[in-house]
């Protein structure tokens, strides 16, 4: 009697999900026990989120940062299924896709990613723009082109949240809009980039000042209208005209994850063990934005792309170990520093004893992210384009 091939189902094709699938495909399963690996995502493309900002300034093209899953998974043995998850039966580990097939699996990986909460103030759902997905970038690009084509005197942009995303967006948009832009950064606390190294925070402050970005600290958003934003500063309400409001504050877990009968924290994140297994469910793994994860030392980890990237290696190994009778490894996070883009051809980085800003940091950031691209083939294509594009531009001119 032949033994049925085990199946691993990975829900979500972001850093956590895709990189787990790719790593699993490389691990040495015994031939008779080699599992079927299924990756499910509602989109047809992976998105290298840290480089999404470069689309706004035409520094990068869509294919470079958002290659199709089918291209990335070619010859890996991983099966890609595009669809929206509409139901997960935890007890039987069965996954139902909207207008799609149903999967039963032996190991389930939850890596569905987070969402931007737009329901925190009145009017945000209707009028604010989020910036997390390729669709978000296209929607913002369409609005920018419309405003640029109108030849208005000024294009007024308010960005809510002076964390990493808010600061990076402010610098890119200020560079794109130039003299026409009036970019405002709104932050509830008394400091921008609170968790950032001091070197990066200083570099960001200088970049924002150079680009004449207004920074409103200790300021709350009261409401957002079709062409206004209402700000509260020390009890005084100001209503300002605005053309675009970008909302970068917060990450929330989708309702599909919140509804699962699994242990969760107050934010709805799934609570995992140091081996990235769901508490009381060793056959289900979770990583990325939807998981509350503590490493081997008990330290609670941030929900960043860098953490998800490293979690993927451990998740893949621990799934392999659980299927082949090997010991599982507790996750050990290695902080590799922090990088931010601060406008066109400008960045800052701090970590591993290195501190850089300006164009040199921009080049180092690009090379670091090129190395992190999902597959060697894609690294080669993108790397060659980065080398050849300046030469092509020079020849055109």
Predicted regions and their residues:
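A Rossmann-like FAD-binding core segment of flavoenzymes
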Residues: 76, 80-87, 175-274, 278-280, ...
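A short alpha-helix-loop-beta-strand transition element characteristic
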Residues: 148-153, 182, 325-333
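Beta1-alpha1 glycine-rich phosphate/pyrophosphate-binding loop at the start
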Residues: 2-79, 158, 167-196
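FAD-site-proximal beta/loop scaffold in flavoenzymes
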Residues: 126-153, 239-310, 317
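C-terminal, flexible cofactor-proximal segment of oxidoreductases
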Residues: 311, 316-397
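Short glycine-rich anion-binding loops that position phosphate/pyrophosphate groups of nucleotides
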Residues: 16, 113-116, 251-253
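FAD-binding core/adjacent interface of flavoenzyme oxidoreductases
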Residues: 1-7, 75-158, 232-235, 246
């Amino acid at each position: 009697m032949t033994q049925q091939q085990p199946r691993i189902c990975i829900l979500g094709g972001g850093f956590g999900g895709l990189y787990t699938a790719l790593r699993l495909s490389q691990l040495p399963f015994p031939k008779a026990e080699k599992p079927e690996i299924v990756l499910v995502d509602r989109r047809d493309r992976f998105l290298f989120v840290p480089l999404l900002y470069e689309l706004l300034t035409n520094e990068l093209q869509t294919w470079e940062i958002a290659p199709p899953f089918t291209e990335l998974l070619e010859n890996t043995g991983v099966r890609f299924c595009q669809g929206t998850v509409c139901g997960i039966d935890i007890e039987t580990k069965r996954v139902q896709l909207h207008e799609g097939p149903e999967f039963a699996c032996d190991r389930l990986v939850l890596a569905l990613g987070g969402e931007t909460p737009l329901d925190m103030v009145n009017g945000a759902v209707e009028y604010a723009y989020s910036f997390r997905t390729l669709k978000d970038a296209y929607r913002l690009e369409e609005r920018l082109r419309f405003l640029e084509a109108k030849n208005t005197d000024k294009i007024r942009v308010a960005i809510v949240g002076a964390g990493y995303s808010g600061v990076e967006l402010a610098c890119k948009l200020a560079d794109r809009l130039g003299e026409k832009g009036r970019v405002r950064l709104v932050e509830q606390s008394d400091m921008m980039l609170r968790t950032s190294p001091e070197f990066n925070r200083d570099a960001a402050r200088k970049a924002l000042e150079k680009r004449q970005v207004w920074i409103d600290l200790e300021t709350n958003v009261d409401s957002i209208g079709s062409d206004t934003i209402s700000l509260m500063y020390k009890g005084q309400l100001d209503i300002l005209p605005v053309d675009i409001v970008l909302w970068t504050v917060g990450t929330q877990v989708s309702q599909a994850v919140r509804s699962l009968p699994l242990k969760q924290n107050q934010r709805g994140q799934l609570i995992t063990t140091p081996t990235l297994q769901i508490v009381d469910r060793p056959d289900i793994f979770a990583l990325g934005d939807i998981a509350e994860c503590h490493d081997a030392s008990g330290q609670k980890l941030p929900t960043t792309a860098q953490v998800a990237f490293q979690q993927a290696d451990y998740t893949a190994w621990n799934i392999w170990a659980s299927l082949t009778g090997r010991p599982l490894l507790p996750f050990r996070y290695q902080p590799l520093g922090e990088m931010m883009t601060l406008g066109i051809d400008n960045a800052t980085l701090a970590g591993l004893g290195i501190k850089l800003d300006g164009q040199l940091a921009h080049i180092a950031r690009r090379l670091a992210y090129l190395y992190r691209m999902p597959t060697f083939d894609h690294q080669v294509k993108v790397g060659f384009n980065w080398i050849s594009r300046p030469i092509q531009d020079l020849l055109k001119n």
